[in-house]
């Protein structure tokens, strides 16, 4: 569950809005006719891709980044946060959108504090172990409050919480290529403290400043993060081109074979042929 699920309970809702919520609210109000047009179109013909929705915004979305003037995309994002619109699947690379009332179960909306508690519990279940209190981020929180039970991480300061349902469970490690947005690496501070893994997504860096590649994938082996895969999908050529496997530790024969299998599996999933470096 992402942070927008909590925002549905908070905005619109009771209490004072945070600064960014006030800005967003004002923009949505200024473009309320566009909001209504989108909802009416979805009500009549949804689910639909964004290309079939009307952009009747009178006040463009202004930013200094790549979202500048992307009115429909930003309006849909805000309607998702408001609990009015939801993703309904996809066709190819296009996401489909529909009225949230057709997608979400008709369950009573919990109070804000109850929603926070449930999110903390789900977040901890996904992470296994996490800080009780962490840095405030504009995206999904990285801490879990009082969910779970107290834990101590040897050599790392701070208050930690552990999911009691996972204590004592047998662990079977495996090899995996992770998304740069996987929960295991999304919290860079936790990643460094628990795994001593140096990694950052470099797609926003100039090419000459990159160390591991434009969209390098962290490599998991067993219970350690051991490297990064620099690969690119050449769809016209039908190939998954592997530029490098950056090894943070020496790879054993078994590790090399396991990572190679993951690369082949990724290529098969993408319907591409893997091309390894010479």
Residue spans for each PLM region:
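Long, charged, low-complexity, helical-prone intrinsically disordered regions
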Residues: 1-278
């Amino acid at each position: 569950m992402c942070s927008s699920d909590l925002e549905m309970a908070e905005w619109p809702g009771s209490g004072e809005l945070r600064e960014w919520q006030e800005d967003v609210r004002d923009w949505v109000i200024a473009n309320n006719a566009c909001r209504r047009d989108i909802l009416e179109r979805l009500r009549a013909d949804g689910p639909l891709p964004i290309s079939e929705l009307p952009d009747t915004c009178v006040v463009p979305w202004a930013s200094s980044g790549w979202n500048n003037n992307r009115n429909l995309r930003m309006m849909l994002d805000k309607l998702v946060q408001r609990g009015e619109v939801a993703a309904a699947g996809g066709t190819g690379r296009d996401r489909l959108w529909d009225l949230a009332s057709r997608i979400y179960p008709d369950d009573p909306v919990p109070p804000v504090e109850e929603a926070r508690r449930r999110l903390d519990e789900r977040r901890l279940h996904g992470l296994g172990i996490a800080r009780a209190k962490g840095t405030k981020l504009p995206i999904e929180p990285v801490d879990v409050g009082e969910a779970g039970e107290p834990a101590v991480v040897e050599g790392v300061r701070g208050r930690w919480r552990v999911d009691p349902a996972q204590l004592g469970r047998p662990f079977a490690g495996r090899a995996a290529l992770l998304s740069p947005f996987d929960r295991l690496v999304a919290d860079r501070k936790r990643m460094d403290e628990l795994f001593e893994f140096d990694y950052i997504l470099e797609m926003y860096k100039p090419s000459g400043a990159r160390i591991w590649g434009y969209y390098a994938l962290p490599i998991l082996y067993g219970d350690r993060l051991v490297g990064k895969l620099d690969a690119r999908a050449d769809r016209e050529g039908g190939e998954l081109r592997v530029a490098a496997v950056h090894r943070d530790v020496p790879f054993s024969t078994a590790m090399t074979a396991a990572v190679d299998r993951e690369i082949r599996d990724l290529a098969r999933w993408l319907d591409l042929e893997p091309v390894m470096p010479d």
